[in-house]
Amino acid sequence: VPVRFLSDVQRNALAGWPEEVNAEALERFFTLGVADLAEVRRRHGDANRVGWALQLCALRVLGFLPDDVRSAPSDAVRSVAHQLDIDPTALGAYGQRAQTRQDHAGQVRDYLGFRLARPEDLDGVRAWLTDQALVSDRPAALFRLACAQMYELRLVRPGVTAVEQQLVGVAREAARREVYRRLQPLLTAERLVVLDGLLVLDPDLGMTPARWLARRPVAASPKAMLGEVDKLVFLRDLGVEGWDVSVLPAKRATSL
């Protein structure tokens, strides 16, 4: 099972509306154009019109539709309602029938040219994301890339957990296996002995060489600099600089 990397706070934030919207974002993402206004006015009733318009704005800016349209930031609600010449409180009566919300969601998707992702769509995004993970497998960055790619493809973003585990988690694991596959020819019997030795406790260091190499200096001092030089000398003595890792993207090779 792919590892979860998002905290509950992050997951909740990514699943819904932002808590607030600044003036620049209001103008950029919550301004309805002439065609938008004409489409909104095809709906009957103030509640349906303001609710539909907010779903339109949500998909346009977020790439998905929050479960509760009525939880939109108050500034956004007021701005959209003002453009429609509707009392903002009308939103409170929106979507009392689940079918209405679902119908409107489909209409908004069609209007903006979005569609729900099919399994084959997600397979394509996952393959693309695996290529990105070969360069850098930072999960938060991959999450953003996955969302941006789906937006570019006009695919409605699935739920946060689906993106986190089924896309990012699986892509990271696939990239990790691909890194190992590409590096396999480097792992000669002699080098395996060297690598295994890094996991053996060194009495002089008081820890394993692997842990010593991974430790970062806590301060910029002459002693710390000498310690880093000692690590470089240690690795040079092992012949690491002669290991050809050009089969990996430069950024990924640097991070090893």
Describe the function of each predicted region.
Residues 2-256:
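Long amphipathic alpha-helical coiled-coil/heptad-repeat bundle
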